[in-house]
């Protein structure tokens, strides 16, 4: 190996991010950037890291997929009994990060978390392929299992159980919405002097924008 990890670096030169050019509303600004990520045909532009923690501050993070967003917040779906589901039930605060390397951009979001409505969870669940719906029954997410064969056996059992009938949504599976209090837009710049614009929600539900030092 000719290069060490310390040698790995890239100079960011594609774009700039100006207070004059961004939307005053962070959701509209996110929509603008997300549409540009789609237009650039990035692989899974809706992939995001979500960080949660226990009440005593033990953190954990993983990748999930954004499935909806509007001015109410950012929605993903999961097993409520999973580690993240349990942590969010006990400590309903989370942080999200989108990283769009090809555009030299990231978006950081933090805020409180709440479950979406039953109808929203149903709507998305029934839009999924049948095997994905079965997977919500098969996997006791985050629990230790003896082998891969355990999952495959359970899949066969549920395929037989729901053969030729509608697969219902498990009560332990559904959507969660991150309701942001802060959203930061980061644009890579040359010499590591990146552009960082932070939107913070005020008491009157308006947003103020500040530039952060990189």
From Swiss-Prot:
Protein name as annotated: Pyridoxine/pyridoxamine 5'-phosphate oxidase
Required cofactor names: FMN
Recorded name of the encoding gene: pdxH
Catalysis performed (reactions): pyridoxamine 5'-phosphate + O2 + H2O = pyridoxal 5'-phosphate + H2O2 + NH4(+); pyridoxine 5'-phosphate + O2 = pyridoxal 5'-phosphate + H2O2
Function: Catalyzes the oxidation of either pyridoxine 5'-phosphate (PNP) or pyridoxamine 5'-phosphate (PMP) into pyridoxal 5'-phosphate (PLP).
Binding site for substrate: 9-12, 67, 124, 128, 132, 192-194
A family per Pfam: PNP_phzG_C
HAMAP family the record matches: PdxH
Molecular function via GO: FMN binding; pyridoxamine phosphate oxidase activity
Organism: Trichormus variabilis (strain ATCC 29413 / PCC 7937) (Anabaena variabilis)
